[in-house]
């Protein structure tokens, strides 16, 4: 559920004030992540790497109060649940957007991910969750990108993270490649 709140009564009061006056309120950070253990868990539990990575992003975000807040049209809204957005290759060769409600239950999250992404891929219809704070993600696995910079628009003001193909070394796996 989405509820308007007074930004002055939150830990984000100053950030909200600065955000509302900024022409492009965005900071882009890039970092190499060692995902060796995540890849090992993925293989051991036979869970697709991107499903597990999206679940970990949701798990981390669910423990941070600020991830439930979203500035929109000059107001601040608080959501009571999260969703993860993924980009899906569809059957026509294009891409579609798919929001997946976050749950702490990894098995349920995996089955929801598989069912929803398969449905979106087949139907070529975007699937959006309107009553949840959506964290944008994308696995651009056909590229070897190191960073994606998102241009702010008032249509997409939610947090976003994107990654390319993971890089396997002899003893380590990283996102993206270390220079």
Model-derived features: positions:
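Glycine-rich active-site loop/lid that clamps phosphate-bearing ligands
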Residues: 140-164
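Small-residue-rich loop/turn and linker elements
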Residues: 67-99
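Acyl activation and transfer enzymes in specialized metabolism, enriched
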Residues: 39-63, 161, 165, 171-179
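Helical lid/core segments from catalytic subdomains that handle acyl or acyl-like groups
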Residues: 90-147
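Broad gene-expression machinery/nucleic-acid interaction feature
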Residues: 26-28, 81-85, 134, 160
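Catalytic micro-motifs at enzyme active sites that drive phosphoryl/nucleotidyl and oxygen chemistry
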Residues: 15-16, 72-76, 150, 163-168
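Short secondary-structure capping/junction motifs at helix and strand boundaries
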Residues: 64-71, 122-127
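N-terminal beta-alpha "docking/capping" segments at the starts of catalytic domains
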Residues: 1-47
């Amino acid at each position: 559920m989405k509820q308007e709140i007074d930004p002055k009564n939150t830990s984000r009061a100053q950030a909200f004030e600065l955000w509302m006056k900024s022409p492009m309120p965005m900071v882009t950070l890039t970092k190499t992540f060692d995902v060796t253990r995540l890849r090992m868990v993925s293989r051991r539990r036979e869970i697709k790497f991107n499903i597990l990575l999206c679940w970990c992003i949701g798990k981390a975000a669910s423990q941070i109060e600020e991830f439930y807040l979203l500035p929109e049209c000059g107001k601040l809204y608080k959501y009571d649940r999260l969703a993860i957005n993924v980009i899906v290759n569809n059957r026509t060769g294009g891409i579609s957007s798919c929001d997946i409600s976050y749950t702490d239950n990894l098995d349920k999250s995996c089955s929801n991910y598989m069912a929803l992404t398969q449905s979106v891929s087949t139907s070529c219809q975007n699937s959006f969750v309107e009553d949840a704070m959506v964290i944008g993600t994308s696995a651009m696995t056909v590229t070897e990108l190191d960073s994606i910079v998102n241009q702010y628009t008032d249509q997409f003001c939610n947090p976003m993270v994107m990654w390319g193909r993971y890089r396997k070394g002899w003893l380590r796996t990283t996102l993206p490649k270390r220079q």
